[in-house]
Amino acid sequence: MPAGGEIFIEFVIQGNFVKATAIDGASGVEASVVGPASAPQAALADAARRKLEYVLKKKTSPSLKGP
C-alpha cells in the first residue's frame, strides 16, 4: 500500500455478526472480514486492513497469483 494512502473502513451489523470492509481510496478495491458482534471494532478493522493489503499485493505481484 502506498505511503499516505487513504483507507476507508465500513462496519455493517448483521444479527450477531459484524462485517468490516476496508476500501482503498485510490483504487476502490475492497476486502471484507466477518466476526462476532462482540469483537472489538479495532480488531475487525485491523483484520480488514491486513486483508486489503494482501489483496492489493496479490494484484501487483505475479508470484502471489494462482495458476
Regions found by a protein language model. Name each.
Residues 2-59:
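Amphipathic, hydrophobic secondary-structure cores in small proteins
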